[in-house]
């Protein structure tokens, strides 16, 4: 359950401009510790840009982003990873020259909680077991299926023991069986109290996993509330879901 008295992440009036294009405009929200927050909206609404701002891949034009009170806006991706934010990507990003175990271990070396040697190997192997790849450690990541590469990317993000986990369309491109497995994996993280922001188009996942949702359209927040509340909102239906999905 979200912690009512602990704010993990605070986004205050964040704007990101690319020349004359405003990708995110005056966006504000708070993420409670142990909360799973859904960030939804149509393509091009600014969701992934917001994830890039939080993770340090982009610098805000204005506004502030605080992780447990520490200003992290624009300090850079490596420093933000060290401070405790880990992510997956819309398109899976593997380290192609490394094995599965080595990919996961990279998260433990460069992230928030650092491990080395046998401790790191054992921890990475335990994470592979957790995501359903107990025997894949020595396999080249390029030999894996798409869903298994996603599992590795999730394990690598978890290897840093992040304070906040960002999942950017982690369920995209999965078939129905893979989708069921993927939702179950994220549900395990939710049950154990992870603090997560999910960008997702799979509404079943949003309904079942998220405590609260923020809906973006054209770079601005148009709705905020529980999944049930925002998915019934008329403006959200017009902007994103369509009448058939109401």
Regions inferred by a protein language model and the residue ranges of each:
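Glycine-rich phosphate-binding loops of nucleotide-dependent enzymes
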Residues: 2-246
